[in-house]
């Protein structure tokens, strides 16, 4: 499993903080916006397309508020994403909704909160079972 991360210019500093945190915790991290100054549309699409290459990959897209990246990610067929700004939502969206991408707002969450959000998202496992009905409903919408 790889954690795919990307940001627009507004999210670059927070992206670097999260990337270091993930690597320090022995996660494989792929930064798809390492040398680019992309718009949130392009940076999020880069994350989504890389996540789609492996069913085990997870993604993190960062912009100023998280909303733009969320809107982009959810436009892609079969992609379930959540805009999160707290640890519980990050954990639950993975466990109950099988979200593969979270979006964060660099102007919304601070460094320590972002690390905790990412930790809970990455460590959570999809529960399946009764939650699969909802996931199937989401996927039928595309």
From Swiss-Prot:
It is an enzyme of class 5 (isomerase). GO terms for molecular function: galactose-6-phosphate isomerase activity; ribose-5-phosphate isomerase activity. It catalyses: aldehydo-D-galactose 6-phosphate = keto-D-tagatose 6-phosphate. Keywords: Isomerase, Lactose metabolism. The keyword Isomerase applies. InterPro entries: LacA, RpiB_LacA_LacB, RpiB_LacA_LacB_sf. It comes from the Bacteria. Gene3D superfamilies: Sugar-phosphate isomerase, RpiB/LacA/LacB. Belongs to the LacAB/RpiB family. Transmembrane segments: none annotated. It holds the Pfam family LacAB_rpiB. The gene is lacA. Pathway: Carbohydrate metabolism; D-galactose 6-phosphate degradation; D-tagatose 6-phosphate from D-galactose 6-phosphate: step 1/1. PANTHER family: GALACTOSE-6-PHOSPHATE ISOMERASE SUBUNIT LACA, RIBOSE-5-PHOSPHATE ISOMERASE B. One of its GO terms (biological process) is pentose-phosphate shunt, non-oxidative branch. Heteromultimeric protein consisting of LacA and LacB. This is Galactose-6-phosphate isomerase subunit LacA. NCBIfam families: lacA (TIGR01118), PRK08621.1 (NF006380), rpiB_lacA_lacB (TIGR00689). Its EC number is 5.3.1.26.
């Amino acid at each position: 499993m790889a954690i795919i991360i990307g940001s627009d210019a507004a999210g670059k500093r927070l992206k670097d903080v999260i990337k270091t945190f993930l690597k320090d915790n022995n996660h494989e991290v792929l930064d798809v916006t390492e040398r680019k100054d992309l718009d949130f549309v392009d940076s999020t699409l880069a994350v989504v397309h890389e996540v789609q290459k492996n069913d085990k990959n997870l993604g993190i897209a960062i912009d100023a508020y998280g909303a733009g990246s969320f809107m982009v990610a959810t436009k892609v067929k079969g992609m379930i994403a959540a805009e999160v700004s707290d640890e519980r939502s990050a954990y639950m969206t993975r466990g109950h909704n099988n979200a593969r991408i979270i979006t964060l707002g660099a102007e919304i969450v601070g460094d320590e909160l972002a690390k905790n959000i990412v930790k809970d998202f990455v460590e959570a496992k999809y529960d399946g079972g009764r939650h699969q009905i909802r996931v199937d409903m989401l996927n039928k919408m595309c």
